[in-house]
């Protein structure tokens, strides 16, 4: 096939383009901005556009298909030309479905935990030597791409999210996959992440359940109230239903042990959310024919997905974790996980907030007491980003202090100041948790960890 990507530079889109080229398709693409690592990956694959920007002339009648990225607007000149010529236009999820019609489609959905559950299943299947394709939203250890598509693998694992498919299609992406096995980990409406109402948000998950193929299977978290609601509201669907819940566990000397029958299996991950994720991953693997012993032997050495409550470094009894999390509920959950795991250690938590998080008072208000379990709390706001949004820095700093309502809070707006703070902080007896909505606020987390863990004179008591 001759396939053209409109908005080829996205993290998932450029991986799909490279995968299709490797399968022998003729692939081209356009974008108005391409950054790393997409730029280098596309250049290495010989798929980097000859010019940056949109050009309707590249859309010709001999194209078999257009794959439209979310980044492209409805008035994109290449899109308009393709519509005029009647070329078949696919959104990303539509195309993935077309390529996986003859496979067992396993789709993992939920507000939180999708990437982690998919990566757990991938880890187990890989260790057991199973052949499978996958589509995941973040780079995972042991896998060199976000997408693997082949003609031979009998199974495809898909991280399915609830956001719209493209600029000309407001259906949720996960409505297109028609899973044989689906999992919903949780359903949590968050005004910081979506502009739709809570009812509309929950409805997307009900419609997702409706798309499960006849006699397919829904795996769901029995401990999530909203999951139970959407499952109950779709009781007429002719599918199998298999609920799961968090397993029993113990923590000893900073290591979590999961109870499996009479055995205590040590894990390399922490937090109740991850334990629930393991239960969900195991249930899916059961439906794929994996035996219990095989699963737990394989999962015991699973490490967190990259930047999802991920261990960074430890020294002299102190540990540093990082987490791709900035919404109020995830902030609270991740802090609780680290505090529970290391209950005898004090915790310093650093959260980066973006201008979007603080633009509206009602969104900021949702953070109230979200860091209450952390002994010290630091909110980082990049003052340059704040200025670009014409926000008065002093006003927003005052609001942050008032809203978070934390007795040991510091608000920092400058990178140099943040470096100095970490260098001066007495880390003995403390752990550190980095939390960010972006790429770790543009810094090297390992470097920050070194500054925090370095021996220094006591400044805090």
Write out the residue ranges for each language-model feature.
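Fold-independent oxyanion-binding glycine-rich loops
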Residues: 8, 30-31, 69-71, 92-93, ...
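Well-ordered beta-strand scaffold positions
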Residues: 161, 261-263, 318
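A generic structural signal for residues located within well-ordered alpha-helices
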Residues: 116, 273-279, 326
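Phosphate-binding loop of NTP-binding sites
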Residues: 19-25, 43-44, 57-61, 70-220, ...
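ATP-dependent carboxylate-amine ligase
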Residues: 1-35, 42-49, 62-66, 82-87, ...
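Short pre-catalytic strand/loop immediately N-terminal to key active-site residues, enriched for Gly-Thr
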Residues: 265-270, 318-322
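Beta-strand->loop->alpha-helix junctions that form or flank phosphate-binding loops
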Residues: 51-54, 90-94, 135-138, 234-253, ...
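Short polybasic amphipathic segments
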Residues: 255-260
């Amino acid at each position: 096939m001759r396939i053209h990507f409109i908005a080829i530079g996205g993290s998932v889109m450029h991986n799909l383009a490279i995968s299709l080229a490797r399968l022998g398709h003729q692939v081209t693409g356009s974008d108005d901005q391409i950054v790393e690592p997409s730029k280098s990956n596309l250049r290495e694959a010989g798929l980097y556009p000859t010019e940056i920007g949109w050009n309707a002339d590249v859309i010709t009648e001999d194209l078999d298909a257009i794959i439209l990225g979310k980044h492209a607007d409805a008035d994109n000149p290449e899109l308009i030309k393709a519509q005029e010529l009647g070329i078949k236009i696919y959104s990303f999820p539509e195309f993935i479905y077309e390529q996986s019609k003859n496979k067992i489609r396993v789709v993992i959905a939920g507000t939180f935990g999708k990437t982690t559950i998919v990566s757990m299943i991938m880890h187990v299947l890989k260790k057991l030597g199973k052949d499978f394709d996958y589509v995941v939203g973040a780079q995972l250890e042991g896998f060199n791409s976000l997408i693997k598509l082949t003609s031979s693998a009998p199974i495809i694992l898909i991280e399915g999210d609830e956001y719209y498919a493209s600029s000309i299609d407001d259906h949720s992406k996960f409505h297109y996959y028609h899973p044989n096995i689906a999992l919903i980990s949780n359903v949590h409406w968050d005004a910081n992440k979506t502009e739709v109402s809570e009812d509309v948000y929950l409805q997307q998950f009900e419609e997702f359940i409706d798309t499960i193929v006849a006699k397919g299977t829904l795996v769901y978290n029995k401990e999530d109230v909203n999951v139970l609601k959407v499952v109950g509201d779709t009781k007429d669907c002719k599918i199998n239903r298999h609920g799961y819940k968090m397993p029993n566990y113990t923590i000893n000397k900073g290591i979590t042990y999961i109870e499996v029958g009479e055995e205590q299996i040590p894990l390399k991950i922490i937090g109740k959310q991850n334990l629930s994720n393991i239960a969900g991953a195991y249930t899916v693997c059961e439906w794929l024919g994996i035996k219990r012993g095989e699963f737990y032997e394989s999962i015991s050495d699973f490490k967190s997905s990259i930047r999802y409550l991920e261990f960074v470094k430890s020294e002299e009894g102190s540990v540093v974790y990082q987490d791709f999390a900035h919404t109020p509920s995830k902030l609270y959950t991740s802090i609780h996980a680290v505090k529970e795991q290391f209950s005898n250690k004090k915790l310093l938590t650093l959260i980066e907030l973006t201008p979007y998080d603080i633009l509206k008072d009602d969104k900021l208000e949702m953070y109230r007491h979200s860091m209450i379990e952390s002994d010290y709390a630091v909110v980082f706001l990049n003052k340059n980003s704040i200025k670009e949004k014409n926000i008065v820095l002093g006003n927003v700093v005052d609001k942050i202090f008032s809203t978070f309502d934390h007795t040991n809070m510091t608000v920092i707006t400058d990178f140099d100041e943040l470096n100095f703070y970490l260098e001066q902080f007495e880390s003995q007896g403390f752990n550190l948790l980095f939390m960010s909505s972006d790429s770790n606020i543009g810094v090297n987390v390992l470097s920050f960890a070194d500054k925090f863990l370095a021996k220094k004179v006591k400044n805090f008591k």
